[in-house]
A protein has these predicted regions:
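Active-site proximal loop and beta-alpha junction motif in alpha/beta enzyme cores
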Residues: 7, 23, 27-106, 112-329
């Protein structure tokens, strides 16, 4: 496959879900083999140029996995999502999600952003099912114009997988003074709800001051976990419950402005730390502030008899721009 080109447009058109914008006869006559439409969205925010940017590529059935990865690297966002024809009859689209480092079975802000993009082109609030490698995700979407809100039910409930890296190594990797990372009830652990992260608690000031040390990061043994979520209770009056930062340079994401999949696993870490009793929870997680891209992620879940019964992740998304991705064979 040859070069990839991305062409922007001044207006954001409304597209049919999973539809290639160039029909087969046009492709046969053109030296450009394929032309696909894309939109960019800022997710977990209701205003442009905040939250986590996302590229949504429509009609991606014609793309190989290698082409998807190359396009993702061209956009150079934390993630891009590709919409394909679903295999399951009850699903409106099938999603493939890529970071610059490779494909993920699930991620939060691409799921929210894809649902918002589909609902916007349909011009109506909707309930839909999206097909991902990590399962079928039921999503409720509401909004109008360019601003939408989506919340998905995660079929993968939070769980603790293993203990985390040594606190001293985490402190070195995140540029924190010795003693910053909690080592008792909030000791580092590997948790996940679809994909795994390592979770580490620190005082709020330390979370805000963390700076990635790539040399020390390379000494961490993260296996196939996607990154480290550093967390603390949010400041009073912030309107949030938790203040977090997610670092994942080994997957091509030095720091992520908003990580719905990491927020989804946070309840498992809090339960293992003795923080959760039975009941219904409705959290707001703030992220991206240190990057100048403030984001808010809603995490709703229920605990019964010490077990997670449900989990939903939600947030706003706003359309930013649109255009075409073109490449020649």
């Amino acid at each position: 496959m040859g070069e990839i080109y991305i062409e922007t447009c001044s207006e954001i058109p409304r597209f049919r879900a999973c539809e290639n914008s160039v029909d087969s006869s046009e492709r046969e006559k053109s030296p450009v083999d394929e032309t696909l439409r894309y939109e960019t969205w800022d997710v977990f925010t209701d205003r442009r140029f905040a939250g986590n940017p996302l590229a949504v590529i429509f009609g991606a059935d014609v793309l190989s996995g290698d082409a998807m990865l190359r396009i993702t690297r061209e956009f150079n966002y934390s993630e891009s999502v590709f919409l394909l024809t679903p295999r399951a009859a009850d699903c409106i689209a099938r999603l493939r999600i890529f970071t610059p480092g490779g494909e993920l079975p699930f991620a939060g802000h691409p799921t929210v952003g894809a649902a918002a993009a589909i609902a916007r082109q349909r011009g109506q609030s909707d309930e839909m099912v999206l097909e991902l490698p990590a399962g079928r995700f039921r999503v409720r979407v509401a909004g109008q114009g360019d601003v939408w809100h989506a919340e998905f039910e995660n079929p993968n409930l939070p769980a603790v997988r293993a203990d985390g890296p040594d606190a001293l190594r985490l402190e070195a990797a995140l540029g924190l003074p010795e003693g910053s990372v909690a080592t008792e009830s909030h000791m580092p652990r590997r948790c996940g709800a679809g994909i795994d992260f390592f979770y580490a608690a620190a005082p709020l000031a330390a979370v805000k001051d963390a700076r990635l040390n790539t040399a020390a990061w390379d000494a961490l043994s993260l296996d196939d976990a996607c990154g480290v979520l550093l967390y603390a209770p949010a400041a009073p009056g912030s309107g949030a419950d938790w203040h977090v930062r997610m670092f994942g340079p080994h997957i091509g994401v030095p720091e992520d402005p908003a990580t719905g999949s990491a927020a989804a696993g946070l309840p498992a870490q809090l339960m293992a730390s003795g923080e959760l009793a039975d009941g219904s929870y409705d959290w707001w997680v703030e992220q991206g502030i240190e990057m100048g891209r403030p984001a808010r992620i809603r995490v709703r879940f229920e605990v019964r008899s010490g077990r997670f019964e449900s989990l939903a992740i939600g947030g706003d998304a706003v359309a930013v721009c649109a255009g075409e991705v073109r490449w020649e064979s």
